[in-house]
């Protein structure tokens, strides 16, 4: 009897350690068309994976246009999903509006944006940490260069954390580094980025920070063409791993681990600890990183990204994650002077 009682106690303890299966719980994910967009596939894969842990039903609502975003939020609320998770900046407006009118039993969360609502759990990122790491990588990979390029989408406060982080990272290795900026004024048109990359190479840049979303393809294409002329330039991708075997000039990518973020949100939801308001995720959370440094990549250019360079970069990433290196960004761009050439 004692043996049976002991086994029963162990069985009860084991059951207590297993997450409760959420029978009847439903999660809706609202996002752009997923396709092969790794920024979104990470989220979908995490939602699928955790469904096996928590036992919830889920639905992915893909939105190719503005009308579909509104319709998807309307449908998710009408169908009484328990957690409505929006991915991307487009979700902020709709999540905030629906949270203001929906029943309190429906929870709202967004990834990579701030809904600015006390009815929504907003998850954004300290992108300056990743940008600093990319800047340090540029310095370690090209220690004899002093001119560095940056191509972004739009000028303004939204991109300051990227520009500041990158510049400070470069200067931590190359103190007399200078920088030149160009902006595509688009999230998706590669043509301006292509032209700017060639212009920046002509100005003396070997390394160009690719901060222009899908426009970065223009930088990557320019790098391939310039290489045929013996004028090598190197760059990085954004958000997801953009390294590839057919383009050795893409050295790394500044990562936003959206799958990790989705996991944090869903775990908190089922633990009853999901809090509304803004949550800013960092390198220490595993939500910010870089290909070949904090995460494996598709393709490695070992001639530039040597073991020594990678080790130096990993030391920087570890210092940021541990809090040994604290990045104190100025309150505004007016409080910082870029060494522009």
Spans of features found by a protein language model:
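Sec-dependent N-terminal signal peptides of Gram-positive bacterial secreted proteins and lipoproteins
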Residues: 3-22
């Amino acid at each position: 009897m004692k043996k049976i009682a002991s086994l029963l106690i162990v069985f009860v303890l084991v059951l207590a350690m297993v997450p409760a299966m959420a029978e009847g719980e439903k999660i809706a994910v609202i996002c752009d068309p997923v396709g092969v967009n790794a920024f979104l596939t990470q989220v979908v894969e995490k939602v699928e994976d955790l469904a096996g842990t928590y036992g919830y039903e889920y639905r992915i609502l893909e939105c190719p246009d503005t009308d579909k975003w509104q319709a998807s939020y309307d449908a998710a609320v009408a169908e009484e999903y328990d957690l409505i998770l929006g991915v991307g900046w487009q979700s902020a407006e709709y999540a905030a509006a629906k949270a203001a009118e929906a029943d309190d039993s429906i929870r709202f969360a967004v990834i990579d944006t701030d809904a600015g609502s006390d009815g929504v759990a907003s998850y954004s990122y300290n992108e300056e940490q990743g940008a600093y790491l990319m800047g340090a990588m540029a310095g370690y990979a090209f220690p004899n260069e002093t001119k560095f390029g940056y191509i972004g989408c739009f000028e303004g406060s939204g991109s300051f954390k990227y520009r500041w982080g990158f510049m400070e990272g470069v200067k931590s290795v190359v103190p007399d580094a200078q920088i030149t900026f160009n902006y595509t004024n688009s999230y998706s048109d590669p043509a301006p980025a292509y032209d700017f990359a060639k212009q920046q190479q002509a100005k003396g840049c070997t390394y160009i920070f690719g901060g222009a979303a899908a426009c970065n393809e223009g930088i990557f294409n320019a790098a391939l063409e310039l290489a045929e002329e013996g004028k090598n330039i190197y760059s990085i991708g954004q958000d997801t791993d953009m390294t590839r075997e057919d383009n050795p000039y893409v050295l790394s990518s500044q990562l936003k681990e959206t799958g990790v973020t989705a996991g944090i949100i869903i775990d908190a939801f089922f633990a009853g600890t999901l809090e509304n308001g803004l949550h800013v995720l960092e390198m220490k959370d595993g939500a910010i990183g870089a290909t070949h440094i904090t995460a494996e990549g598709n393709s490695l250019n070992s001639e530039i990204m040597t073991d020594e360079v990678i080790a130096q970069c990993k030391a920087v990433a570890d210092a940021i994650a541990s809090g040994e290196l604290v990045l104190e960004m100025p309150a505004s761009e007016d409080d910082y002077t870029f060494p522009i050439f």
